[in-house]
From Swiss-Prot:
Any one GO BP annotation for this protein: fumarate metabolic process
Protein name: Fumarate reductase subunit D
Keywords: Cell inner membrane, Cell membrane, Membrane, Transmembrane, Transmembrane helix
Membrane topology term: Multi-pass membrane protein
Subunit architecture: Part of an enzyme complex containing four subunits: a flavoprotein (FrdA), an iron-sulfur protein (FrdB), and two hydrophobic anchor proteins (FrdC and FrdD).
Protein function: Two distinct, membrane-bound, FAD-containing enzymes are responsible for the catalysis of fumarate and succinate interconversion; fumarate reductase is used in anaerobic growth, and succinate dehydrogenase is used in aerobic growth. Anchors the catalytic components of the fumarate reductase complex to the cell inner membrane, binds quinones.
UniProt keyword GTP-binding, yes or no: no
Similarity-based family: Belongs to the FrdD family.
This protein's GO CC annotations: fumarate reductase complex; plasma membrane
SUPFAM superfamilies in the cross-refs: Fumarate reductase respiratory complex transmembrane subunits
Amino acid sequence: MINPNPKRSDEPVFWGLFGAGGMWGAIVAPVMVLLVGILLPLGLAPADAFSYERVLAFAQSFIGRAFIFLMIVLPLWCGLHRIHHAMHDLKIHVPNGKWVFYGLAAILSVITLVGVLFI
């Protein structure tokens, strides 16, 4: 018989954050590494485009703060989701693993939000 009151799963929320973090890490993060780690040090990017004043103005704008927040938080959720499922696959039992890994991701997300908003 079909259960008339099925238990709702919270897994789609975590899979959504995992997918968003993986996509961000695959598309946006390599561009930032190329730009900040290769093009700027080699002098291949216009120097005035990435002056301290312009970068600071961007980082203090709403869009800049959102970008910095997403640059930190989405890969964080992706990584902790991967670690959570890797522990399961390796048959390493972490007591309350869902609370440990997703709770850590949530706590670090709040810390990042506070840091991005107030610093």
